């Protein structure tokens, strides 16, 4: 049995969606479990020529034999969930998705409070999804749980029990985190952070898996850094410089333009240390080094790219096992057999 957790190494938008889709398609886990805050972050998935922006359903949905679980630590907006059921109908997502009855529920009131809050909407740069107010109500013990929502009755399951049963019987579980380390309520650039911790240990707790059962922690970084909203960004470059490097990105949930910066080695080292990373996945290498676009062999990477990868490994002490060189799943260099 193996239990792997995938986490974002910076401020989110690291390319977790593609990594999850690739890893789940290749490794074929029995359960893919969503951890993290809730529908305030979007994962982009490109598969068979189609693009999907997901906020609750695990990005590994393309592995159609897996059960899809949403852990107790995740906030659920039933409207978002049901829309994704419809959007992913051909993958039979509705029939194999299960929500822990202890998930807290986001309501219209939470969304309105989020959007109307001068502090959250303007200073912090909240996505307006209602996650902050919902987590606040959870702390106050006034929030509704999934068990209280009749429309969710057919989708309820004890996620912790099911994931641990699979692991205890030799199966494989993949835990999908959201956002990124630098947005952690505890370790991020406070107060410009999200409404809970976003590290690997919390993602395990979100799903109800104990730390002794976790085998791999895969920390995802882009070859450059991006950030949506306000807050410190030490390596930020101007929009003009970003455009000169052909980098222009927009958030999946908000549509806001992402700020761009150079790779931050100090952030990477701290992220790997606190997450307990055992592997690094490096994405968007083709954006920084266009001559490496769609490369599928490490030997075919340019000397400059290899030097960059080796520097990350040397500084963090963590092997770079996955290198993404394009948006398609086949544009991936998988070095796990060689390095692990």
Swiss-Prot record:
Localization annotation: Cytoplasm
Residues binding IMP: 13-16, 40-43, 127, 141, 179, 194, 256
Cofactor remark: Binds 1 Mg(2+) ion per subunit.
Main location: cytoplasm
Annotated Pfam families: Adenylsucc_synt
Enzyme class: ligase
Cofactor(s) in the UniProt record: Mg(2+)
Residues where substrate binds: 252-258
Single GO term (MF): adenylosuccinate synthase activity
GO (cellular component) term, any one: cytoplasm
Keyword Ligase: yes
Active site (record annotation): 13 (proton acceptor), 43 (proton donor)
UniProt: Mg(2+) binding residues: 13, 42
Keyword Repeat applies: no
Protein name in the entry: Adenylosuccinate synthetase
Species the sequence originates in: Methanobrevibacter smithii (strain ATCC 35061 / DSM 861 / OCM 144 / PS)
């Amino acid at each position: 049995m193996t239990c792997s957790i995938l986490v974002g190494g910076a401020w989110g938008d690291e390319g977790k969606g593609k990594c999850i889709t690739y890893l789940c398609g290749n490794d074929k886990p029995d359960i893919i479990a969503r951890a993290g805050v809730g529908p305030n972050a979007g994962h982009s998935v490109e598969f068979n020529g189609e693009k999907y922006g997901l906020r609750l359903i695990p990005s590994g949905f393309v592995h159609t034999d897996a059960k899809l679980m949403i852990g107790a630590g995740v906030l659920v907006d039933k409207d978002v969930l049901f829309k994704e059921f419809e959007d992913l109908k051909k993958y039979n997502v509705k029939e194999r998705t299960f929500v822990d009855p202890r998930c807290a529920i986001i309501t219209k009131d939470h969304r309105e409070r989020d959007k109307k809050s001068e502090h959250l909407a303007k200073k912090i740069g909240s996505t307006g999804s209602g996650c902050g107010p919902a987590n606040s109500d959870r702390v106050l013990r006034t929030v509704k749980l999934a068990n209280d929502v009749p429309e969710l009755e057919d989708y309820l399951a004890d996620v912790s029990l099911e994931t641990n049963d699979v692991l205890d019987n030799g199966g494989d579980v993949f835990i999908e985190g959201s956002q990124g380390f630098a947005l952690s309520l505890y370790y991020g650039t406070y107060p410009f952070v999200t409404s809970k911790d976003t590290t690997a240990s919390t993602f395990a707790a979100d799903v109800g898996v104990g730390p002794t059962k976790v085998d791999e922690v895969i920390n995802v970084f882009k070859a450059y850094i991006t950030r949506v909203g306000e807050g410190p960004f030490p390596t930020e470059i101007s929009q003009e410089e970003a455009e000169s490097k052909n980098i222009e990105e927009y958030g999946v949930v908000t549509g806001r333009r992402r700020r761009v910066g150079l790779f931050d080695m100090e952030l990477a080292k701290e992220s790997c240390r606190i997450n307990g990373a055992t592997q690094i996945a490096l994405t968007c290498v083709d954006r920084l080094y266009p001559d490496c676009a769609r490369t599928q062999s490490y030997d075919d990477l340019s000397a400059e790219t290899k030097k960059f990868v080796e520097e990350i490994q040397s500084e963090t002490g963590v092997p770079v096992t996955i290198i993404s060189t394009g948006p398609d799943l086949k544009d991936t260099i998988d070095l796990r057999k060689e390095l692990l």
